[in-house]
Structures are given as C-alpha cells and as structure tokens.
C-alpha cells in the first residue's frame, strides 16, 4: 500500500519533487471565549517572522545517525497565513504548503513534524499532500490535535499518515517515532502540576472530591476505576487528598480530550458553573423570600409556562463580571431583567396527568431513563442476599393475597412459570445505607421492592410496592416493612398509592444517577481512554476503532469532579444519598464485571432474555415489547458485526493478536492499573483470541455510545418534571390518625409535593438536567466520523459504510415500531415515543440539536 510505485519513482526523472499540500486548521479566534486576543497577537507575530513550519519524515529512508529514524526533509512554511482571515465564529481555515522533497534520497514520506512559532495554539485538523511520488493519490495526515507554541514541548510534534499498522508492520523508519509518541503520551517521568498543553495520560485515584469524603480507588473498602492524573499539589490539611480548584479554574485534562469546538465545551462548562455559582444563590434568596415550597403541581408547571423572577444577589452580579460577555444573556438571569424559565419536559407535553397513571409508571421501567434495572422474578416471595449475620431475614413481606387478584386468573406459581412476574428490587441496594442516609437533614428514604405483572396485551402493570425501613433489633439491621397495592385515584388511599410509587421513583432516581449513569458509563470508561492513549499508537487499528468513542469523556468527568459529584456539589445537594453517594457507588463497583456490560449478557443475567440460536440476535426477549432492549439488541448486533468485520482485516488468526505488543500492553494495564482494584477477578478476558478482542471492543463501544445515550438523554424529558422522578423523599408515608394523613385528605397535591424533592432542590436539579440532556450542534453520532479520511484502508472504509447503512436501517425500524399500535410500551399514556436509541446516524448537519430525546452519540461527552 505504502510502497507501491516506489521503484518506478526512484528511477527516471523524479529525483526531486515539489510536493504541494493543503493544511486545514482551526485558529484561536477573536470571539474565542477564553482568549480574546489570540488572533491579533498572532498577526503581529507573523510580521516578526514567526509562523508555522512543517517537515516531512521518510517512511523508507533511515538516518543511521539519528537512532534509525526516518530521514527528515527541509522545512516548509504555511502560505497565506496572514491573508486567510478567520471567520466571525471559530471555524476552519485552509492554507497552502510546498515541500522540496528529494525523492532519491528521502523516498516516500510517512510522517510529518509540525512546529508552531505563534504565541497561541491552534487545532490542526488535517494535512493533505497531492500527487506524492511512490503513492497513488493523496497522502493525508489526520491530526485533530491542538498544537501549542513550540516552547511548551520537550519534543517535536509528529503526525503519521492515515495508514494503519500493527506494531510488527510499522515501517522501520517510522517505528522509533511511533515509540517516542507513546512514551511522550505516557509521561511517566513528568512531574506536575500538568498544564493544558501537556499531553500526559496517567492514572490517579478519586482523592480530589473534597474533605470529608473517602478516597475512591486504591483500597479494599472503596475500590474504584481510576481517573486521569492532574498532579495538583496536595490538600494543605490532608496530604492524602489532592487540592481543589476554584470553580472557574480549569481541571487538567490532555488538551486533545477537550471538545473540538471551543464554544461547545465552554458553553457546557459555563452552564454548569452558572447554576452552581450564580443561579443557586439567587434561588436560595428566592426561596427565603417566598413561602419556599411548591404547593401544587401547577406551581411546578409554572416553571415551564411562566418562569420565576430571581432577585438580585451579589453572587449573580459577580458572576456577570467573570463570564464572557456573549454568554451572560443565555445563562444568567439577572434581577428582574429576565426570568428563570425552563422548557416543558416531554413527559407532560401531550398530557399533564399521564405520568400519574400506573401504566406510565410501569412503562418507564421498560422505556424510561433507567430501563436497565427490571428483572424477572424467579421465586416468591422475593428473597434477600444481605448477610443474615448482620441483617437478619429480609425476605419480602409481599404475599400471594396481595397480588393474585390482579394476575388475570393465574396463581402466583403459574405466573412465575409463564414468565409473567417481574421486579424492580432496590431493597438490598439501599438497606445497608439507610440508617446513615436517613440521618441526613431533610431525608427519609425507604428501601423498595416493586412487583409487576406482564399482561396479556404486552403491557406491565404494578402489583404491589413494599416499603422497608431499617430497624436495629438484637444487634441486627432488620426491616420494618409495609406493602401497598394499587388503588384508583380520587381517594386518600389512592394518594397513598401515588406516594408509594414516588418512594420507588426516589430509589430508582438515586440508583440511576449514581450507578446506571455515573459509575457504569462515565467512571468505568475513563481507564480505557487513558490506557488506549498510553499504549495504542494512532496508527494502530484498534486505536482507530475505539478513539471516536472516547471523545470528550475525560473532560466531562473532570467537570463532574469539580462541580457535580464533589463534596457539597449539585449531586449531593439534589439526590438523596447525599454525602454517602460516591461511597455507595464504590461498594457497587466491587461486583462490577466487564463481561456483563454487553447488552445480551445483561439481559440474560436479569432474566429478561434467554439464549436462542434461532433468534436474529441469538437471544429472545421474554417481554417482547421492551423498547430499550428491542432497539438496543439491534444496535448491539450492528456494532458487533462492524467490530468483527473490521478486526478481521488486521487479525487473520489468534497468533497475530497474541504477538501484538501494543494490544497486550493496553489490556494488561487496563486490567492491572485502570481497573486495578479488580485485577484479580477471574472474569477478565485473557486477550488471547480475536473473538475476545472483538467482544471487548464491542462492549467498550456499547458503553460509550448506546448505553450512555439510553441513561442520559432522557433525563430532562422524563425527570425534568420532578413529581415523575423525585430525587429525595423527606418524610414517612402518612399513617391514618396523623396530621400528615389529614393533610393528604385535605390537600393531597400539597402533601405529595412536601414529601418529595424540595423547591430549591427541584429548581437546581432540573436546571442541571436540562443542560445534561442536550445534544450539541456538532454532535457526532454512532456511524459518523469527524474526518472522512480517518483511514487510508479501503476495506476499513467499506466496513464502516456498511455499519452506517445498518444504523440508518435501524432508524426506520424504530420509527416503524413507534407507529405500531400493537406495541403499547413504545409511547404510553404520555404519548412520548421511545427514541433514546434511535441512532440519528442520518443527521449529518446537526439538525437534531438541543433537547431532542433521541440520538446515540459516539461517546460520553455530556
């Protein structure tokens, strides 16, 4: 591929050549949110003789005096740098480039050195050489990398052509450059604190969340995936902790991990910081100067239909001075000048009451924002797996008498045997923590079990809800439980049932944010991002396969550590586990298994599917109208086919994989360091066969794309109306004879609302969910790449096109299922079609930006 025509080139007239090229980059712009003067200063620098230079590196001619590296050609400068004026928004600029290349001496170029002598960085996207001797067609270098001024680096910035090589196949002249680049990215000998121009990927534990919180990772009590290291100085009062930054300072992540478009990243960062530093104090003042509570559902709906006027507060005024001018109007309501007004969540757009129905409550277990929890019931009554020596007997108190009247004539045993009983079981998950959690101010949380019946028409219906609270008896944490069954609305008993569903939703909301979302997508992915960059060259086929699914993940995780999951952060403030939240997630991580994260394995583990070789995806759903699973299996299968076909190009047999030094180092470090607290678990794949690699890559892509999309982008559409997905419960279920019960009879909406998430928690929580549920206009969806020339391999390009085409076909199937009246779980009473796993591959223009409740981005970027 690379050497084609070389001999012909070296004989004949082409002993030297002038190679013409094109450079595409994005300059720092006069409207850049972070650096207003970048373009002006660069212009002055150019007149002083500064600029950008490039040097080609040979892939065929070796310089024995330079460690066997490929020979380096003469410098070439960008042409028309000054006259190519930037657009008003940060956009691409194109420049010419001409190389004097001695073909006879230097052979065929395969890499390029880029030097930046300007005073600010730029984003190098691609360099394309035309009519290169020794190659057919163009030679493209895909960079997508920020180039800082040369003085910031201890080494030259080298980029490789878009060819693909296993380590053993790399041209000898380029091998040292490949090894150098990986060594630079590992940066194991570099001391911090790291700056934004540093390109260092190292690991650290979660010791940066603030004082009074456990260190997550590196200890048996709180095992955890690793995060990216920043090398900030230790905390002054506790050296085992890393010091915190102020909210407007930037946490270090390697610059190429940050959002490609500056405005996108800054808008997200400023949005979250606006909520934390500006809107929160204003809302606190608002709450202090008003009754401080919502009293009816209409009060909450007014957030969307009318908004609330925020008072002037010093913190909000101060933030106005610190934020870039053009963001203030969008992000910061100031005094009476503007309202805090939120968009109407999808769940109440068509019908403001549908969320209260039992049908919608059950449907969201299959097609809501947390559709990954429901399991098939295999024994009755449900048993507990809690240690009886610590907790006693926690067997469920739900009896056959509670549920048999709603089983369509079946007995409990018949319903079990016919796969008609299902459970949302949060009992064991929360019971061990409830004594501590309920000692937090404003908390009273139950551990819940909810039983569902699969009706003959394919819909689920709730049968019973068990609410349990911990009781200390004889040195054991036993349970005091009560069972509630459905009651029609309109009576006080009906409102008791409504509250029982709300307590379940509180459990499910907490678990969703803490585990389904944060731990099982964001946190577990970061070690793969770090290890891939440390051990897989950009020329490696597996790097090319996985890198799109890492975009922006380290950035959003760093932002989360700074403002969301930190001590006293928004998560602790708005979701019930409070300061115990992250510690609880560490306990859950003890049982995390990478091999169970793929969708088919997860469905089988939960009893929602069985293996079936005759089914299209080799598994058969036991609830056929399970929108998350039905759409997800189609997506999983498409990813699986793509990965298998792609890897087959480069790994004809297992021996090639076993001899791949980079993949073996990558997998070893992922297991032993990135997920090092679980390194001795027996389930880790050995990475000795191509099917093992294919399954691992499919799982990584699934987690970063579809799984995250399923649990993230429905947050505001479903939970933006807090009564549907409350995050906190503040008091016990009202009992007859109490004032709370009398209030429930007298003013049921007020009693309901005063039991769940408070007004200030609601306003802050839904403001955040709105930000986190949006798609950016430059979103890259599954089946899309940021650069068409991501590889020079026509076989790989063809495999990827087939993948994209399959995803577009799935889009049509999803829309078709949503219009099928037989599939009642696709829309539900709220008339909100399930589109969270609609790929949106066909949208190449960013038309579906904002709160769309659809689309599978390539990566965890928000």
UniProtKB/Swiss-Prot annotation:
Highest taxon in the source lineage: Eukaryota
GO BP term, example: fatty acid biosynthetic process
GO molecular function: linoleate 9S-lipoxygenase activity; metal ion binding
UniProt domain Lipoxygenase: residue ranges: 164-862
Pathway membership: Lipid metabolism; oxylipin biosynthesis
EC category name: oxidoreductase
Cofactor mode of binding and number, as noted: Binds 1 Fe cation per subunit. Iron is tightly bound.
Residues noted as binding Fe cation in the record, renumbered to the chain: 517, 522, 708, 712, 862
Chain residue ranges for the region called Disordered: 212-241
Cofactor(s) in the UniProt record: Fe cation
Keywords tagged on the record: Dioxygenase, Fatty acid biosynthesis, Fatty acid metabolism, Iron, Lipid biosynthesis, Lipid metabolism, Metal-binding, Oxidoreductase, Oxylipin biosynthesis
Catalytic activity annotation: (9Z,12Z)-octadecadienoate + O2 = (9S)-hydroperoxy-(10E,12Z)-octadecadienoate
EC number: 1.13.11.58
Domain PLAT per the UniProt entry, residue ranges: 34-161
Subunit structure, as described in the record: Monomer.
Protein task: Plant lipoxygenase may be involved in a number of diverse aspects of plant physiology including growth and development, pest resistance, and senescence or responses to wounding. It catalyzes the hydroperoxidation of lipids containing a cis,cis-1,4-pentadiene structure.
Further remark: With linoleate as substrate, lipoxygenase 1 shows a specificity for carbon 9 as the site for hydroperoxidation (in contrast to lipoxygenase 2, which shows a preference for carbon 13).
Family according to the record: Belongs to the lipoxygenase family.
Protein's recorded name: Linoleate 9S-lipoxygenase 1
Source organism (scientific name): Hordeum vulgare (Barley)
Lineage of origin: Eukaryota, Viridiplantae, Streptophyta, Embryophyta, Tracheophyta
């Amino acid at each position: 591929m690379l050497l084609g025509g070389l001999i012909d080139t070296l004989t004949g007239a082409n002993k030297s050549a002038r190679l013409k090229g094109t450079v595409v980059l994005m300059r720092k712009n006069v409207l850049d949110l972070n650096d207003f003067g970048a373009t002006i200063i660069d212009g002055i620098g150019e007149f002083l003789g500064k600029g950008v230079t490039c040097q080609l590196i040979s892939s065929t001619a070796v310089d024995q005096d330079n460690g066997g590296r490929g020979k380096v050609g003469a410098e070439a400068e960008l042409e028309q740098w000054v006259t190519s004026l930037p657009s008003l928004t940060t956009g691409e600029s194109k420049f010419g480039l001409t190389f004097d290349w001695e073909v006879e001496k230097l052979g065929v170029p395969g890499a390029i050195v880029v030097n930046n002598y300007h005073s600010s960085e730029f984003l190098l996207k691609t360099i394309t050489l035309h009519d290169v001797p020794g190659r057919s067609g163009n030679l493209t270098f895909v960079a997508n990398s920020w180039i800082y001024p040369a003085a910031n680096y201890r080494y030259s910035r080298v980029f490789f052509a878009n060819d693909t090589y296993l380590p053993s196949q790399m041209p000898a002249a380029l091998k040292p450059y490949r090894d150098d680049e990986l060594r630079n990215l590992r940066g194991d000998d570099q001391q911090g604190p790291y700056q934004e121009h540093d390109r260092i990927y190292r690991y650290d534990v979660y010791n940066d969340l603030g004082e009074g919180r456990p260190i997550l990772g590196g200890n048996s009590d709180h095992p955890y995936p690793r995060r990216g290291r920043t090398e900030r100085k230790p905390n002054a009062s506790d050296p085992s902790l890393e010091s915190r930054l102020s909210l407007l300072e930037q946490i270090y992540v390697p610059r190429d991990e940050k959002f490609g478009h500056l405005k996108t990243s800054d808008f997200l960062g400023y949005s979250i910081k606006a909520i934390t530093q500006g809107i929160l104090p204003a809302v606190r003042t608002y709450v202090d100067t008003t009754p401080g509570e919502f009293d009816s559902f209409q009060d909450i709906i007014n957030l969307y239909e009318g908004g609330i006027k925020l008072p002037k507060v010093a913190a909000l005024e101060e933030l106005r001075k610190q934020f870039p001018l053009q963001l203030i109007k969008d992000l910061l309501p100031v005094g009476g000048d503007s309202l805090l007004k939120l968009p109407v969540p999808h769940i109440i757009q068509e019908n403001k009451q549908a969320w209260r129905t039992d049908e919608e409550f059950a449907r969201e277990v299959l097609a809501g924002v947390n559709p990954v929890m429901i399991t098939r019931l295999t024994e009755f009554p449900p048993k507990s797996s809690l240690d009886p020596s610590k907790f006693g007997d926690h067997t469920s108190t739900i009896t056959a008498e509670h549920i048999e009247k709603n089983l369509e004539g079946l007995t409990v045993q018949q319903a079990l045997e016919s796969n008609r009983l299902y459970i949302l079981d949060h009992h064991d998950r929360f019971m061990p923590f409830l004594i501590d959690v309920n000692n937090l101010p404003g908390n009273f949380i139950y551990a819940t079990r909810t039983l569902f019946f699969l009706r003959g028409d394919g819909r689920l219906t709730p049968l019973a809800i068990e609410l349990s609270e911990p009781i200390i008896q004889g040195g054991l944490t036993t349970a005091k439980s009560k069972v509630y069954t459905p009651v029609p609305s309109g009576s006080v008993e009906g409102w008791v049932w409504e509250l029982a569903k709300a307590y379940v939703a509180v459990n499910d909301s907490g678990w969703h944010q803490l585990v389904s979302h944060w731990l099982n997508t964001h946190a577990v992915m970061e070690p793969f991002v770090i290890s891939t960059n440390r051990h897989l060259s950009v020329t490696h086929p597996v790097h090319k396969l996985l890198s799109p699914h890492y975009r922006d993940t380290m950035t959003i995780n760093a932002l989360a550590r700074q403002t969301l999951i930190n001590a006293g952060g928004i998560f602790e403030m708005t979701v019930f586990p409070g300061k115990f939240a992250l510690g609880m997630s560490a306990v859950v991580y003890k049982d995390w298994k990478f091999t169970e994260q793929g969708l088919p394995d997860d469905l089988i583990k939960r009893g929602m599917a069985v293996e079936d070789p005759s089914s299209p995806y080799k598994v058969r759903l036991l609830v056929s109208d399970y929108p998350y699973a039905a759409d997800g299996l189609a997506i999983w299968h498409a990813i699986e086919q793509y990965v298998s076909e792609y890897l087959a190009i480069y790994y004809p047999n297992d021996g090639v994989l076993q001899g791949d030094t980079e993949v073996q180092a990558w997998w070893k470090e992922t297991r032993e360091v990135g997920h090092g607290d679980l390194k001795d678990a027996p389930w880790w794949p050995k990475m000795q066969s191509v099917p093992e690699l294919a399954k691992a890559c499919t799982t990584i892509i699934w987690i970063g794309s579809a799984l995250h999309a399923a649990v993230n982008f429905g947050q505001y559409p479903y939970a933006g109306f807090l009564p549907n997905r409350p995050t906190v419960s503040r008091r016990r279920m009202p009992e007859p004879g109490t004032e709370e019960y009398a209030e429930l009879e007298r003013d049921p909406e007020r009693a309901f609302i005063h039991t769940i998430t408070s007004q200030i928690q609601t306003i802050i929580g839904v403001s955040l969910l709105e930000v986190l549920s949006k798609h950016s206009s430059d979103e890259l969806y599954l089946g899309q790449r940021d650069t068409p020339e991501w590889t020079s391999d026509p076989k790989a390009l063809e495999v990827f096109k087939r993948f994209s085409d399959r995803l577009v076909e799935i889009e049509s199937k999803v829309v078709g299922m949503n219009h099928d009246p037989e599939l009642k779980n696709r829309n539900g009473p709220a008339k909100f079609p399930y589109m969270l796993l609609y790929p949106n591959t066909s949208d190449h223009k960013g038309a579906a930006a904002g709160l769309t409740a659809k689309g599978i981005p390539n990566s965890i970027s928000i």
